[in-house]
Amino acid sequence: MRATDADWLDAAARLAVRARPLSRPNPAVGAILVKDGVVIGRGWTQPGGRPHAEAVALKQAGDRATGATAYVTLEPCAHRSERGPPCCDLLVASGVPRAVIGVADPDPRTSGKGAQRLHKAGIETHILDHAASRASLAGYLTRTALDRPHVTLKLALSLDGCVATMSGHSRWITGEAARAHVHSRRALADAILVGGGTWRADQPRLDVRLPGLENRSPRRIVLTRGVAPEGVEAISAPERIAQLDGVQYLYIEGGPLTAAAFLQEDLVDRLEIYRAPIIIGGGVSAIGDLGQDALADAHGRWALVDCRQLGSDSYEAYSRTR
């Protein structure tokens, strides 16, 4: 079966994830060069934001780039930097006759200009508004559009929706496979947040403890009106996340009150639920009171985007729909 443009962009989006979170402050972008159905170059944004994905892929392809199609998750940049020329100029110089772009860049320095420059140079250019590309750029797009990080709320709970027994015992609800997966998700975040209660009760390390990924531990944030512990930043209210400079992806592991606080402020973009096959009965609910009176208001807010088995536990990811 012949791969479609969307298929190649799917592959580029998977490459883009490799850039997180080390590409900051630049977005994590993926690029693939395809010629006669064969990948001749691939790249993703490098640590510190340079080189860009297109530059990496073009360097790998070399002279073979002439006649290839370029697949890029984000519209190639059109502004010159002291660290290198615009990516659209690199593509024009490479001799690619066709470019397929996943998402238009909302940055006013590039928005529309990158695609326009390619088109003026005679390159057949398409912008698809591609779902996987958009998902891989969620942090950048959220920060640009809403001036805040993309927020993921993680919950580990029992079949009956509890995060702890009534006595407060919560270690461990899920098994080793689920906990390792949590560490892989932490490694993709710029910052991780817990509530003051969780910090005082557990003193969590909030780091990444997977071999080879120790350098990807995120910044640690505590939601508290008190003084931040040493080595930890503090914010006093959920809406203050907008002030976290350099943070495109925020991962929340707080307790019921913290979860409710962010949900009430409509600041959660993604829910990640790790569900263990246990029943606690009468335990601590995963989410505090949201003041929800009508069930109709609760429906239609979340769509399942991923699910898998992790040992004996299940993992479900939901994206906000409204």
Q: Where are each of the predicted segments found?
A:
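Proteins enriched for Cys/Gly/acidic motifs involved in redox and nucleic-acid/cofactor modification
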Residues: 21-22, 50, 115, 126-156
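Short capping loops/turns at secondary-structure boundaries
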Residues: 84, 107, 111, 144-148, ...
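Short, well-ordered, mixed-charge alpha-helical segments that flank or form enzyme active sites
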Residues: 79-81, 107-111, 133-137, 160-165, ...
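Enzymes that bind and transform nitrogen-containing heteroaromatic metabolites
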Residues: 2-26, 41-42, 60-61, 65, ...
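Short secondary-structure transition/capping segments
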Residues: 111-115, 137-141, 204-207, 283-286
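Short acidic/polar alpha-helix capping motifs at helix-coil junctions
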Residues: 20-23, 52-55, 78-82, 145-146, ...
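Zn2+-dependent cytidine deaminase-like catalytic core
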Residues: 33-132, 261-263
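Helix-turn-helix
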Residues: 30
